Amino acid sequence: MPTCERAGFLSHLLNFGFFVGVIIMNERIIDYIGEENFRKIANAKVLLIGLGGVGGYTFEALVRSGIKFITVIDFDTFENSNFNRQIYATIDSLNKNKAQIVALRALKINPEAKITCLDKKLCENDITKEFVTEYDYILDACDDTLVKVELMKACALY
């Protein structure tokens, strides 16, 4: 995209309330999927359950893709045993809540990110119609089989 067109494009996106740094950061995504699709993704409400080995990398990809509204659920803290497989497990995060740590990281990548942290252990009884319909996308990275089953049933039903 030539410079003048790009400047007009950025100005156009600012009218939709986008932070210019986020747009520049996601320029390659926008070039690939288009501005309308990017706007849909950026404003989607996403729930991520679990921030361990799979969930941590998933969260990083969501934030770096420009998604602004992410709710994360994880009751756990980072431990020594997490260092070999979890992206956010560092000396600084040791014994700290996973949800809080990833939220801080998200703001360093995208200052417009709105991360909601739920420091709780999700139970199968928590999976209700109201719970699943609050989000546009639900990503399951938890290690509780009963929660996984209820979540799949609820998502298919609602």
Question: What is each residue range found by the language model?
Answer:
Residues 49-50, 73:
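Conserved N-terminal Rossmann-fold NAD(P)-binding element of oxidoreductases
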Residues 67, 72-110:
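Glycine-rich phosphate-binding loop and adjoining beta1-alpha1-beta2 segment
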Residues 119-126:
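Conserved SAM/SAH-binding loop
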